[in-house]
Amino acid sequence: MQSRKSLKPEKTVQTVFSWDSPGLMAGVDEAGRGPLAGPVVAAAVILDPFNPIMGLADSKKLTALRREKLYDEIQAKALCCSIALATVEEIDSLNILQATMLAMKRAVEGLRLKPNKVLVDGNRLPTLKILAEAIVKGDALVPAISAASILAKVYRDRWCGDYHLQYPQYGFAGHKGYGTAEHLAALRQHGACPQHRKSFAPVAQVLR
């Protein structure tokens, strides 16, 4: 992994150990379904039961500083982590739900260790060749899903920071691509950039 805080988006990023073990369970979650810009990011995490991580919770309930610290700790202590994304182009061609499922599928397939079961936050499942279960509010109930939610959220927030430097007029570093009043005003003033989701109504309106 890059040592600096900001990351360029990649299809898959992972940290692993080189040994396998039966009975492995992976938690999966996503970040970025709602924003008007940027990829949707998914993460899959297999935690080490002998190396626990304290303070795991739904990423939305944590401060940005706490998420950053847990991101590094998860990368260091988990047996295996994988982060993947679906691009803006894929979101526009597939729709956001199918793009989210694709990102989750890529995250699971990016794990070096093959889990016996996958627990996914929410009520939908990606198409997998592994036993999987959807857990509503799983990011608050299952530590591995909490860890995945933190990885996905931090990775995507860093992506927004990178693209803020490229397109400062939109304020991506602040609103993370969501449809805030500031973001909508910038869209009306500057039009859409290549990272805006053209299939989303507020973006489509300025392209007419």
Swiss-Prot record:
Residues bound to a divalent metal cation: D29, E30, D121
Disulfide bonds: none
An example molecular function term from Gene Ontology annotations: RNA-DNA hybrid ribonuclease activity
Highest taxon of source: Bacteria
Pfam families to which the protein is assigned, alphabetical: RNase_HII
Reaction equations catalysed: Endonucleolytic cleavage to 5'-phosphomonoester
Cofactor: Mn(2+); Mg(2+)
Gene name of the encoded protein: rnhB
Enzyme class: hydrolase
Protein name in the entry: Ribonuclease HII
UniProt xrefs under InterPro entries: RNase_HII, RNase_HII/HIII, RNase_HII/HIII_dom, RNaseH-like_sf, RNaseH_sf
Cofactor note: Manganese or magnesium. Binds 1 divalent metal ion per monomer in the absence of substrate. May bind a second metal ion after substrate binding.
